[in-house]
Amino acid sequence: RRQRQMCIRDSHTNMFSATWPPAVRGLAETFMRLPVRVTVGSDVLSANRRVSQTVEVLDDGRMKERRLNSFLRSIDAQKTNEKILIFALYKKEAQRVENTLRRWGYRVSGIHGDLSQHDRIANLEAFRSASTPLLVATDVAARGLDIPNVEYVINYTFPLTIEDYIHRIGRTGRGGKSGKALTFFTDEDKAHAGELIRVLKDAEQPVPKEMDRFPTTIKRKTHSSYGDHYKELVPGKAKKITFDDDD
């Protein structure tokens, strides 16, 4: 707001965002008169096709720890400096997974809301430099962080929305490179089965046969770009101009 107050009243303002969450959009609207919204591509959020997605359906959530250990051993994670970003759902879970990995002998750090800003920055820089090639994070790291050369994203616990899933796996396969994402899916996540299957099919990724046991109904959203809790914050909608990717 302070920066905006420094601009002359009749200035022409362009605002850009990779995503357009309601809070940011509402703030932007307070600065604008008769705005025009320009969308490049589709409003439907889709997964990066350069990311190879693997979904493991587990009968019991308690199997996650064993499967994580098995996967890290299979890629020889202790002997390489490949960056592996592991997502947990809650702060306490993230800390527990981090402690477990450290006990197994891995160089690991974490990012979540219980850490100070200083510690979060230090842990992020250690991950960037691969001095600690494993990072356990909550969804605080799912958006906005551009960390180069992340080889794997592991969804230890499925997120609360399919949008968060797409943003999580988007931390790999950046800058034109390919990436890999592994997701543990349990009965507790069955409400997301239909949306996850859609994302996998749209990206031409394999759908595990075990997903057949889950309901595939996709609940209607109020807005495809902004997720389940989108709410129009201003009474007048802007004009919308949409360009296809080929334009």
Residue ranges and their predicted role:
Residues 1-5, 9-223, 240-247:
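Conserved helicase RecA-like core
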Residues 229, 235-238:
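Intrinsically disordered, low-complexity, serine/threonine- and charge-rich segments
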